[in-house]
């Protein structure tokens, strides 16, 4: 094994090579927004540099991985529009792209590391490790692996095996500091006592993440590793492993590393994938646009300009520079996420918006019977709805008055609107509306305006009882356009029903 001084690694290892990045999730549970942000930054980096995004599945944990989660990952990436250049369903020169199908490769690399002295068998039992770790803590010393099996003789190994002990494989860390320049955090130096020898193969022969991840990066010629801050501590170990892989002819170079900031949730705690607001499925079910969600997630650690929050994916790709990513934790703000999504909804052309709302206009989201839906009325109301909704699922409550036989019953809205003398106001408004031109929303507005004036009310106060009578809600789409689209007979019938309820 070579003993040359450990090199100081630069953040830029382009060397004229095309940029190759990877997104490598594990198929466990539902995709979450932190995972999406990592995928987005890798995708934007690859597209900005006309590079390659490798989509790799880290499915070596048979107890936790599932085919359902794997399919969810693929579906989520497709829904988000984050296309990949190599990986599942596409293939590529480094296939297969599922780690569970690459076990022979890892076994071969582990054997080469052992043969060259970069790794060694460790026979320590869990109890022995715990005892020595506790003793180190009590003495105020580092509690990592103490190198007990680092330099066993052949006789000592044979003796352990004669006892029936099994062994894991540990990688031998260099006895010197490792310095690297993180693309996000700058120069980082880690002392050897803080990075002990670590396991790379289990006793049953199964390779660990600590081996398979950097081996795949090496074999797939990854040039830049952009990942979460939680993996920063593993970087010195991987850099040391890369040095060994390079000397064995398995890797060409050590990639540049960039560690993205934590995403914080409620109470300034790191957003966990178990937090309800972390689930990507939540945003899909609520009707976030992929562009709106990605726009917001890109702001968790990066910005396109100090005074600009809304931009397209093309603009993101054109501007994205990993060196502009902030190392400080980013707080997830649902309200801001909703605001940005609403702006992206406004940016859609009406036809695209109309089509995008489709799923929320039928079962299981829509409370009306399928035959009650009127496509012509929906097409007419859609432009007004587009200026009001925050997420696409908002559309159901905004237009249900058109397709239900009767407006929804909301006692809070009813109580709020029917103050003063609502019977007198609605009676006058009904008479004025009956005589109005129902092809002209302005005529309907004047009908309610004059009714209000007759009772000493401004338009805002006067239209509230009419709105609740017709739509069931105090807040909604422009009232007079809504009345026109609902139609004269149905609108007047609902005012009559409200009067009957008030006088019962």
Curated annotation (Swiss-Prot):
Q: What does this protein do?
A: Catalyzes the attachment of glutamate to tRNA(Glu) in a two-step reaction: glutamate is first activated by ATP to form Glu-AMP and then transferred to the acceptor end of tRNA(Glu).
Q: What is this protein called?
A: Glutamate--tRNA ligase
Q: Name one Pfam family in it.
A: Anticodon_2
Which GO terms label this protein's molecular function in UniProt?
ATP binding; glutamate-tRNA ligase activity; tRNA binding; zinc ion binding
Its assembly, as annotated, is: Monomer.
Q: Which UniProt keywords apply?
A: Aminoacyl-tRNA synthetase, ATP-binding, Cytoplasm, Ligase, Metal-binding, Nucleotide-binding, Protein biosynthesis, Zinc
The entry's cellular-component GO terms read: cytosol
Q: Where is this motif: 'HIGH' region?
A: 25-35
Catalytic activity of the protein: tRNA(Glu) + L-glutamate + ATP = L-glutamyl-tRNA(Glu) + AMP + diphosphate
Record-linked Gene3D superfamilies: 1.10.10.350, HUPs (3.40.50.620)
PANTHER family the UniProt entry points to: GLUTAMATE--TRNA LIGASE, GLUTAMATE--TRNA LIGASE, MITOCHONDRIAL-RELATED
SUPFAM superfamilies found in the cross-reference section: An anticodon-binding domain of class I aminoacyl-tRNA synthetases (SSF48163), Nucleotidylyl transferase (SSF52374)
Tell me the residue numbers annotated for binding ATP.
273
Q: What is the lineage of its organism?
A: Bacteria, Bacillati, Actinomycetota, Actinomycetes, Kitasatosporales
- Residue positions binding Zn(2+): 122, 124, 149, 151
Subcellular location, in the record's words?
Cytoplasm
Record has Metal-binding as a keyword: yes
Instruction: Give me the comment on cofactor binding.
Output: Binds 1 zinc ion per subunit.
Protein family per UniProt: Belongs to the class-I aminoacyl-tRNA synthetase family. Glutamate--tRNA ligase type 1 subfamily.
Q: Which cofactor does it need?
A: Zn(2+)
């Amino acid at each position: 094994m070579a003993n040359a001084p450990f090199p100081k690694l630069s953040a830029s290892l382009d060397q004229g090579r095309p940029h190759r990045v990877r997104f490598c999730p594990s198929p466990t549970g539902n995709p979450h927004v932190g995972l999406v942000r990592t995928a987005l930054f890798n995708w934007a980096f690859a597209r900005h540099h006309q590079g390659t995004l490798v989509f790799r599945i880290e499915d070596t944990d048979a107890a936790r991985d599932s085919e359902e989660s794997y399919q969810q990952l693929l579906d989520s990436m497709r829904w988000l529009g984050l296309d990949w250049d190599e990986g599942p369903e596409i293939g590529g020169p480094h296939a297969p792209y599922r780690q569970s199908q690459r076990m022979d490769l890892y076994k071969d690399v582990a054997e080469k590391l052992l043969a060259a002295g970069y790794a060694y068998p460790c026979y320590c039992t869990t109890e022995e490790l715990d005892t020595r770790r506790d003793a180190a803590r009590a003495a105020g010393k580092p509690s990592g692996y103490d190198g007990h099996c680092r330099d066993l003789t052949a006789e000592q190994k044979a003796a352990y095996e004669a006892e029936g002990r099994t062994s894991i494989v540990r990688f031998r860390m260099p006895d010197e500091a490792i310095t690297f320049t993180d693309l996000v955090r700058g120069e980082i130096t880690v002392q050897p006592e803080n990075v002990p020898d670590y396991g790379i193969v289990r006793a049953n022969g199964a390779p660990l993440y600590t081996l398979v991840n950097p081996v795949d990066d090496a074999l797939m010629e990854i040039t830049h590793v952009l990942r979460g801050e939680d993996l920063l501590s593993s970087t010195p170990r991987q850099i040391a492993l890369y040095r060994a892989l390079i000397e064995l002819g398995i890797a060409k170079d050590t990639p540049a590393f960039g560690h993205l900031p934590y995403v914080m949730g409620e109470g300034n705690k790191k957003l966990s994938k178990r937090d309800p607001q972390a689930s990507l499925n939540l945003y899909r079910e609520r009707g976030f646009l992929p562009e709106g969600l990605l726009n917001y997630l890109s702001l968790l650690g990066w910005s396109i300009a100090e005074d600009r929050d809304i931009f397209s994916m093309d603009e993101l790709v054109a501007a994205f520079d990993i060196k502009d990513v902030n190392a400080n934790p980013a707080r997830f703000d649902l309200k801001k996420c909703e605001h940005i999504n609403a702006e992206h909804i406004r940016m859609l052309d009406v036809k695209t918006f109309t089509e995008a709302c489709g799923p929320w206009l039928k079962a299981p989201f829509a409370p009306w019977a399928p035959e009650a839906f009127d496509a012509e009325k929906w097409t007419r109301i859609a432009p007004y709805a587009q200026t009001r909704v925050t997420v696409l699922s908002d559309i159901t409550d905004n237009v249900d008055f058109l397709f239900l036989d009767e407006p929804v019953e909301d006692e809070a809205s009813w109580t709020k609107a029917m103050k003063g003398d609502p019977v007198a106001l609605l009676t006058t408004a009904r008479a004025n509306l009956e005589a109005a031109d129902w092809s002209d929303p302005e005529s309907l507005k004047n009908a309610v305006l004059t009714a209000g004036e007759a009772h000493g009310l401004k338009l805002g106060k006067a239209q509230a009882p009419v709105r609740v009578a017709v739509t069931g809600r105090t807040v909604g789409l422009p009232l007079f356009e809504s009345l026109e689209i609902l139609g004269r007979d149905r609108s007047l019938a609902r005012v009559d029903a409200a009067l009957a309820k008030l006088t019962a």
